[in-house]
């Protein structure tokens, strides 16, 4: 099934974030590819992925790819795509993980045509589950695990900059080499530690601990559980059972958003949180406190 250089030879395929979420285009892609690489390390809780792809494509052409295969041995994948149709399949959407952007750039530089086949993104589904306005989400951040050896000061600053623009923040939780996701409590604890350090350097109070937060768990069947916390400080000490989570840190909520978020999280009464924290953040925004990196 070799193809000329003018044909699409590298397919970046999104498989959706749960079984049964595959598009017809994704199914067709793995069935016609000469070789199919399946990677699940960029999305925790996707152990189902390999079996699902094998059921669609047949086991003979499917290769389970490691982080090293895609990041350190990507040249081998690109070389193979010079004269064969190669599919790289990931849970969710392939362009959410920066690894796949790098792979696409390397392939294009080598003269390999690239085709992007979108999938249902777990990140976007988590945002949707909160029922907050799509247009009010700002830059996404990742809370790094302690194994990175970094203090996420830049993450704290990005959240403040989103708040200054009236935008909600989606915070992803880091994944280690074993595919285990950082726990929400530990991730938030490290963030609040970074916020205190950032506040000292910026000459402003640390405020993130007072912000409300939403924990969204992606269910294996595509459903979601939305858990509301009145403050990040409370979430940092919470004993949350194992699962695959994203965190949403809301900006100042509109009346409609507050009502919808309460409904999404099963709250039977108005949301409780420290509304005055937004006034303090907005005052600091006007003073330009968060504009200069530290």
Swiss-Prot record:
InterPro entries: 4pyrrol_Mease, 4pyrrol_Methylase_sf, 4pyrrole_Mease_sub1, 4pyrrole_Mease_sub2, Dphthn_synthase
This protein's encoding gene: dphB
Domain of life: Archaea
EC annotation from Swiss-Prot or TrEMBL: 2.1.1.98
Family, similarity comment: Belongs to the diphthine synthase family.
SUPFAM superfamilies: Tetrapyrrole methylase
Name of the molecule in the record: Diphthine synthase
An annotated Gene Ontology molecular function: diphthine synthase activity
Pathway assigned in UniProt: Protein modification; peptidyl-diphthamide biosynthesis
Cystine pairings recorded for this chain: none
Reaction catalysed by this enzyme: 2-[(3S)-amino-3-carboxypropyl]-L-histidyl-[translation elongation factor 2] + 3 S-adenosyl-L-methionine = diphthine-[translation elongation factor 2] + 3 S-adenosyl-L-homocysteine + 3 H(+)
Record has Transferase as a keyword: yes
Protein task: S-adenosyl-L-methionine-dependent methyltransferase that catalyzes the trimethylation of the amino group of the modified target histidine residue in translation elongation factor 2 (EF-2), to form an intermediate called diphthine. The three successive methylation reactions represent the second step of diphthamide biosynthesis.
Residues where S-adenosyl-L-methionine binds: 93, 96, 121-122, 173, 220
GO BP: methylation; protein histidyl modification to diphthamide
EC class (word): transferase
Keyword Methyltransferase carried by entry: yes
Keyword list, A-Z: Methyltransferase, S-adenosyl-L-methionine, Transferase
Record text on subunit structure and interactions: Homodimer.
